[in-house]
């Protein structure tokens, strides 16, 4: 029996192995815990800037979760093939809604609507497909100094959003109240403490735990309203073109450029995955197919109302730490996200998170984005 269990356990470290459901579930849940808040927070932030109703916010969150699941499945199990190309890297990566696009989406939303963002996302997806096809030829146009500077600037530009949320959200009646600051800094303290001193699941779930603590503390202050949860449906599929699709030149150019940069940056996540967990560098075809899938899934996501996705570095960290590269484990994580994406009550519950809690929890996320940019810049070879 022990030999059988040992053999089954070894399946976890095999890309195409078939571990038992009991072994795969906790590892899959670990991936979900590490990324789910980061996956829905951009949708919540954009909904606030765009002035979406509670029902439309739920639809946006649903689509974001569903598209994260679909994008991950396509990357894990490529099934679309055309000549020498296939859509999906076939590597153990998790896809989720990217914070990198939040500053540009906020800027667009101030003068346009969500449909304009989704239209630009379609253009960005086309750009990513082109980058994927010619990645070997154009990779030199985006050295670490360029991509790192852009990523660092994105991280810094997100801080005003976090501070506004910590204060209660711009335009709220209690903006800047002491209650908001107390809850926000308590949430930030919990996240920071667990991130620096926690181990295992406590460290991986630091943002989720911080939000749970902040959420509970905010209840006595009357910051939580659960009425939207009661009104939400139990089951609903993502709605095709719910927000419409509109094209505006400046929005398309801005998001298209960011898609090109993120396409090249994705090479870092693919490389970290294969080098750290599989003891090899990624093959050119894997990079090419992965970036092309990034473009295709974002086009599909725009049609279903989902925001731009990208590889999630925190999940890359889990894979390289545990060495669990089995695609069925990550596929199960994607399935959990997919189920969450078709349950409006779950999405409605996420909309009840007070803005001060969300602000306190995401400061560390924005800091990590800025640090990633600095690391990229530091890795560049300088000629003096």
Could you describe each region identified by the protein language model?
Residues 59-60, 83-99, 140-149, 202-209, ...:
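Short, non-helical or kinked segments that cap or interrupt transmembrane helices
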Residues 108-225, 334, 338-384:
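Membrane-embedded alpha-helical modules
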Residues 54-59, 189-237, 242-268, 381-384:
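Flexible hinge motifs at transmembrane-helix junctions and intramembrane kinks/re-entrant loops
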Residues 1-93, 99-108:
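N-terminal signal-anchor module of multipass membrane proteins
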Residues 1-27, 226-241, 275-282, 290:
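Intrinsically disordered, low-complexity non-transmembrane regions of multi-pass membrane transporters
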Residues 29-36, 54, 146, 177-181, ...:
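Hydrophobic alpha-helical transmembrane segments of multi-pass membrane proteins
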Residues 195, 315-330, 336-341:
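Interfacial segments of multi-pass membrane proteins
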Residues 21, 47-88, 257-327:
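Membrane-embedded helical hairpins/re-entrant loop segments and their flanking transmembrane helices
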